[in-house]
Curated annotation (Swiss-Prot):
GO molecular function: DNA binding; DNA-binding transcription factor activity
Protein name: HTH-type transcriptional regulator XapR
Gene Ontology process terms (BP): positive regulation of DNA-templated transcription; regulation of DNA-templated transcription
Lineage: Bacteria, Pseudomonadati, Pseudomonadota, Gammaproteobacteria, Enterobacterales
Name of the gene this protein is made from: xapR
Organism, as annotated: Escherichia coli (strain K12)
DNA-binding region extent: 24-43
């Protein structure tokens, strides 16, 4: 079994002062302590390690080979320890840390992009890890505390112990080819899409499970003719006349050639929410929440 040493950092600081000064009196003055206790501490360290660190003369000391090695390693260890403690202080102030953030793909369009860009620029020591997951998976990861927060378009309230905050209001639009027979409508009834073919993305990237339920509430299940991974590919296929899609209004900013966007007559909210465990908010998360909700 590997030996566990009980030497604390204070003993190493005492040793390093003597090793650098090569004189107990000067080292004691540097440490603002008297010489006898310093000599006792150095002897204690030598006893713990079972080796002599200094050769003592009447007016000076010389490092042994073991002492020279310990001096090099002690400098490195104390610098590392100081860096670790400084980082923990930064984490406590929200100036550093890591945030595991679940997102649906559609969340990264619209207002969130400039907000996140500014947050990352202003907090360079906060590492935000984006994990693209469908809402149900995000909620499961939140409950297992594998995510700090999740962002999706809410259809239900979160479980007890979790908080949801609306980041901004949004709505779903119909994206269709510009020559589509519904393009003359200023608003499109959802039931008018009953016989249309849909192009969409997998649930991990989008809100399609929610949209399917909304369509079923007005009496039809949408027919998916193509499923692709990127919103740009969805809109490219819409522009080719392959099908239509329901998409958050933030995508209308993309201004795709050959694609027109129309609001639905029955507004389907696409409001974006952030969900997190109420009692597990780190200082870095507090800063992120402030940035996202200001």
């Amino acid at each position: 079994m590997e030996r566990v040493y009980r030497t604390d950092l204070k003993l190493l600081r005492y040793f390093l002062a003597v090793a650098e000064e090569l004189h107990f009196g000067r080292a004691a003055a540097r440490l603002n302590m008297s010489q006898p206790p310093l000599s006792i501490h150095i002897k204690e360290l030598e006893n713990q390690l079972g080796t002599q660190l200094f050769i003592r003369h009447s007016r000076s000391v010389v490092l042994t080979h073991a002492g020279k090695i310990l001096m090099e390693e002690s400098r490195r260890l104390l610098v590392n320890a100081n860096n670790v403690l400084a980082r923990i202080e930064q984490i406590g102030r929200g100036e550093a840390g890591r945030i595991e953030l679940g997102v649906v793909g559609t969340a990264m369009w619209g207002r969130m992009r400039p907000v996140m860009r500014r947050f990352l620029r202003e907090n360079p020591n906060v590492d935000v890890l984006f994990r693209e997951k469908m809402p149900a998976m995000q909620m499961a990861l939140l409950e297992r505390r594998e995510l700090d927060a999740g962002i999706w378009r809410m259809a239900t309230e979160p479980p007890t112990g979790f908080t949801s905050l609306r980041l901004h209001e949004s709505a779903f639009l119909v994206a269709m080819p510009e020559e589509h027979h519904l393009s003359s409508f200023s608003t499109v009834p959802l039931e008018a899409l009953r016989d249309e073919y849909f192009v969409t993305m997998p649930p991990v990237y989008t809100d399609w499970d929610f949209l399917q339920r909304v369509c079923q509430q007005v009496g039809f299940s949408p027919v998916v003719i193509r499923e692709v991974n990127e919103p740009q590919t969805v809109l490219a296929m819409v522009s080719m006349g392959i099908g239509i899609t329901l998409i958050a209004d933030s995508y209308a900013q993309m201004n795709w050639p050959g694609v027109i966007f129309r609001p639905l007559k029955q507004r389907i909210p696409a409001d974006l929410y952030i969900v997190y465990e109420t009692q597990q908010v780190t200082p870095a998360m507090v800063k992120l929440l402030a940035a996202l909700t200001q």
